[in-house]
Amino acid sequence: MSRAAAKFKIPMPVTKADFAFPSLRAFSIVVALDKQHGIGDGESIPWRVPEDMAFFKDQTTLLRNKKPPTDKKRNAVVMGRKTWESVPVKFRPLKGRLNVVLSSKATVEELLAPLPEEKRAAAAQDIVVVNGGLAAAVRLLARPPYCSSIETAYCVGGAQVYADAMLSPCVEKLQEVYLTRIHTTAPACTRFFPFPPENAATAWDLASSQGRRKSAVDGLEFEICKYVPRNHEERQYLELIDRIMKTGIAKEDRTGVGTLSLFGAQMRFSLRDNRLPLLTTKRVFWRGVCEELLWFLRGETNAQLLADKDIHIWDGNGSREFLDSRGLTENTEMDLGPVYGFQWRHFGAEYRGLEANYDGEGVDQIKFIVETIKANPNDRRLLFTAWNPCALHKMALPPCHLLAQFYVNTEKSELSCMLYQRSCDMGLGVPFNIASYALLTILIAKATGLRPGELVHTLGDAHVYRSHIDALKAQLERVPHAFPTLVFKEERQFLEDYELMDMEVIDYVPHPPIKMEMAV
């Protein structure tokens, strides 16, 4: 929470919770089909591949960490009524999962009637009936309590539900397709799911395959594959890294590590419908992103506040040795001087150390932007800067991301942001910066009653450190997944008082972390 007095904070409007949740929940598909895209006859599956059934159970039941569901977190399986009825009674509802059944007429009681009476009460805790199609189901799962209690929503059939999944608005939320190809043609099939569909607006990438195997029962050959929608926005980032490594100019730098660099690039990321551009080809440290951005918004300069939360991204620049190397011998250790947040909230004020109270001092650029957007959304001076030439010598590190301009689309009531970053560490810093300014734009939109629109990231010296080349080559081999969603579980009276615990990133499916050392 900000230590500023209330009159110097930015009050949140009554509309602050209007866009706390997405319109629809992201979801995945699990399906098995034959050579002709057949999935069954509407009542049963015309082949026996127990390995696929075991995969279905594990994929839809286990959490992403491969651990069993808990009282607080489990997955959901969304199905039509006929699919529900095709499940043997003894397995209804599917254990360890929330069963979401689509039916315009049936009630929970009717669906559970075939079960032994003594099991119905417990079973009722694992089933929800939705009067509508797939869109209605994922709309329900996007809201509390399900947005937090459900880790992954799986669409499991039948044919009409699968078909709906491939059409707008659902297809825009489809994150993964787990597809088992049964290498046979089943004449009994009367239901089909052609994937990938022809002439689809969405391109699909093969993310993984377990390889072609032979079933131990009937000897049928099968292959379990995972497809993801092509993430063009993350590919911008990967393609820029590839271009830098192939054509960049070799340069020496202040760290002594050396870089490959090019000058002038731009990337664009949609923030619409709570989308958060958190890169997926390696896990991005969201907790660090969020805590640092809130630290900026509060005008803080004490890196120890982050270190106390086990966030050590500023430890190197706040060390006694580094501060002394910058001539900041009078700064206490972890006092970074008038860096980012200080310039955002107190531009032009005289810096007197990390313990001083700066309420009302300098220009509060963030508050000015919020107030101006409300009064005149067409203003072309909606920008702030962290680059203060008069104070650079007092900073532990001159700002890398130094200028941001906001733009209001008055026709759509959307707020977009363009960031200019002078020095762009593509391996470590840029993924962090993308997520940070996305969150900033989302918060400023909340504070002004607007929807988040787009983040435009303009890069000056875009560089790859030589020590990061091997790690980035490995990252380039990975297939990007869909971006996650940001939801707000709690709201605050003032912008600066939001906390990490008030937000939750859902449906984030990244590749494992890749170790890269920071060049200091």
Curated annotation (Swiss-Prot):
Q: Which residues bind dUMP?
A: 254, 401, 421-425, 433, 463-465
**Pathway(s) the chain acts in:** Cofactor biosynthesis; tetrahydrofolate biosynthesis; 5,6,7,8-tetrahydrofolate from 7,8-dihydrofolate: step 1/1
**Which reaction is this enzyme known to catalyze?**
(6S)-5,6,7,8-tetrahydrofolate + NADP(+) = 7,8-dihydrofolate + NADPH + H(+); dUMP + (6R)-5,10-methylene-5,6,7,8-tetrahydrofolate = 7,8-dihydrofolate + dTMP
Q: Which residues form the active site?
A: 400
The record's PROSITE patterns line, in alphabetical order, gives: DHFR_1 (PS00075), DHFR_2 (PS51330), THYMIDYLATE_SYNTHASE (PS00091)
CDD domains associated with the record: DHFR, TS_Pyrimidine_HMase
Query: What are the entry keywords?
Result: Methyltransferase, Multifunctional enzyme, NADP, Nucleotide biosynthesis, One-carbon metabolism, Oxidoreductase, Transferase
Q: What is its EC number?
A: 1.5.1.3, 2.1.1.45
Q: Could you give a single Gene Ontology term from the biological process aspect?
A: one-carbon metabolic process
UniProt domain DHFR: residue ranges? 26-229
Q: Where does substrate bind?
A: 30, 52, 162, 180
MF annotations from Gene Ontology: dihydrofolate reductase activity; thymidylate synthase activity
This protein's superkingdom? Eukaryota
> Which residues hold NADP(+)?
32, 38-44, 81-83, 102-105, 157-164
Record flagged with keyword NADP? yes
Q: Name one GO cellular component term.
A: mitochondrion
Q: Where is this region: Thymidylate synthase?
A: 234-520
Is the keyword Transferase in the record?
Answer: yes
Q: Could you tell me what this protein does?
A: Bifunctional enzyme. Involved in de novo dTMP biosynthesis. Key enzyme in folate metabolism. Catalyzes an essential reaction for de novo glycine and purine synthesis, DNA precursor synthesis, and for the conversion of dUMP to dTMP.
What protein family does this chain belong to?
Answer: In the N-terminal section; belongs to the dihydrofolate reductase family.
PANTHER family in the cross-refs = THYMIDYLATE SYNTHASE (PTHR11548:SF2), THYMIDYLATE SYNTHASE 1 (PTHR11548)
Q: Which NCBIfam families match?
A: PRK01827.1-3, thym_sym
Q: Which HAMAP family match?
A: Thymidy_synth_bact
Provide the protein name.
Bifunctional dihydrofolate reductase-thymidylate synthase
